[in-house]
Amino acid sequence: MKNINPSQTSAWKALEQHFAQIKDIHLRELFEQDPDRFAKFSATFDDQILVDFSKNRITTETLKKLQALAKETDVAGAMRSLFSGEKINCTENRAVLHIALRNRSNTPMMVDGEDVMQQVNAVLAKMKDFSERVIHGEWKGYTGKGITDVVNIGIGGSDLGPYMVTEALKPYKNHLNMHFVSNVDGTHIAETLKALNPETTLFLIASKTFTTQETMTNAHSARDWFLKSAGDEGHIAKHFAALSTNGQEVKQFGIDTKNMFEFWDWVGGRYSLWSAIGLSIALSIGFENFEQLLSGAHAMDQHVANTPFEQNIPVLLALIGIWYNNFFGAETEAILPYDQYMHRFAAYFQQGNMESNGKYIDRNGHPVDYQTGPIIWGEPGTNGQHAFYQLIHQGTKLIPCDFIAPAISHNPLSDHHSKLLSNFFAQTEALAFGKSREQVDAEFATSGKTVVEVEHVAPFKVFEGNRPTNSILLREITPFSLGALIAMYEHKIFVQGAILNIFTFDQWGVELGKQLANRILPELKDDNRVVSHDSSTNGLINRFKAWR
């Protein structure tokens, strides 16, 4: 990958000039000027996903200039580096090949001169065998009973992805009850275990190193809970599996290394649901559906690798995001799925985006002079409409939004889905076009009120509009389409990181807090007054000790 400061490129400077020319143009004007705007500013993937980006504050000229930025920052070269197994995670000297985990074409994927597909396929085969034995009741607990409940213990990428996917694909789930424990707060594991039977519970301990503080604290508490009933440590092997690479620690914990599912250092945590970390997904929806999830992601990988940038959906979304973040000064993006099963999707890509591109040092080791990753947030519709949409519609912040919805519902009750989708369509229309003072006055006139009578309230009913949105309409949320959608966002994040000249696949920002926590933990063991920190931290620790 080339290390190019985007703000010093001629394309960036051209975009600055272009922004000054069009920043005040309203979406109403853009649609009036071009009745076929939707056809020109939308794209379809595999007849499964429609992405409508026409309600963005862009013109054909904007896209040309953004494409020039992608070319000048060598996004094509960055993609080649990603797909070829080059060690583009330079600060950790690692390749980035989560795409190999879902490489259904089985074409060679090289790391250090070795094709990794044999290893990938071996782990997938092991996952298939294990998941099918558990699902079909062949895997027995220590009293001879089958498994009824699966508890995934992990944090970050070892939790967010599997939890999001198992929730999104609940219509495909089998009889197994899935539970996810992540927080080191003892309440999380305690509340989860209350309703479980140790005779029929399987724990998946998801930690690459098997030393992650939060995960191993919860794992040991689960182990203690289990042994209170089982007694014999030999029974641990029937109720615990490890998603890890540290065989020594796994064995010491009591887990049979035959039940250890491996992944590799070229799999980043927030891109790991495609790996052994996805075992909970396979257990929840069955291995065939897990393979469909992989196939959908692989299809999107093929789209990204082989589609010209002018029609390349993740590239287009990445460029539009940079346009708002760096030229309009938008600081956040909202992800708003109109599907209750997708209620963790925004949280998943909050990590996916903010941990990937929340960097202020560029690939040359210098502070950047432009914006990098945005703040990502969101909740399912229509709940959000009754919570924070007020600010999106009439606030002083520009918040680009992704609206996501399936055309076909898994639960076609009465007219629920039509009402849901009517809101989906209405919100993007309202955000784009708003309501003028003239329209407000006309509405009041229709109801028989004069302008004088409503003067005090009319200004508050005006919607400026010109709020940008992408509408992402899926035919139906299936394992395949969800896999493609996730991969679409992954590649959007990668393309933005490539253009912004930052390392997308490390996460050094999480380290300092962990180091300080390890220093503070021993200080909490006694009641002695602490004076080793700043006055604020000392004061907080000492009040905690006094109150506990």
Curated annotation (Swiss-Prot):
Known pathway: Carbohydrate biosynthesis; gluconeogenesis; Carbohydrate degradation; glycolysis; D-glyceraldehyde 3-phosphate and glycerone phosphate from D-glucose: step 2/4
Catalytic activity of the protein: alpha-D-glucose 6-phosphate = beta-D-fructose 6-phosphate
Matches recorded under PANTHER family: GLUCOSE-6-PHOSPHATE ISOMERASE (PTHR11469:SF1)
Cytoplasm is among the record's keywords: yes
EC top class named in words: isomerase
Gene Ontology molecular function: carbohydrate derivative binding; glucose-6-phosphate isomerase activity; monosaccharide binding
Keyword Cytoplasm: yes
Keywords: Cytoplasm, Gluconeogenesis, Glycolysis, Isomerase
Family stated for the protein in its record: Belongs to the GPI family.
EC number: 5.3.1.9
Gene (name only): pgi
Lineage: Bacteria, Pseudomonadati, Pseudomonadota, Gammaproteobacteria, Enterobacterales
Main location group: cytoplasm
Function: Catalyzes the reversible isomerization of glucose-6-phosphate to fructose-6-phosphate.
GO cellular component: cytosol
Protein name: Glucose-6-phosphate isomerase
Species of origin: Photorhabdus laumondii subsp. laumondii (strain DSM 15139 / CIP 105565 / TT01) (Photorhabdus luminescens subsp. laumondii)
InterPro entries: G6P_Isomerase, G6P_Isomerase_C, Phosphoglucose_isomerase_CS, SIS_dom_sf, SIS_PGI_1, SIS_PGI_2
GO biological process entries: gluconeogenesis; glucose 6-phosphate metabolic process; glycolytic process
Pfam family, one: PGI
Subcellular location: Cytoplasm
Active site: 355, 386, 514
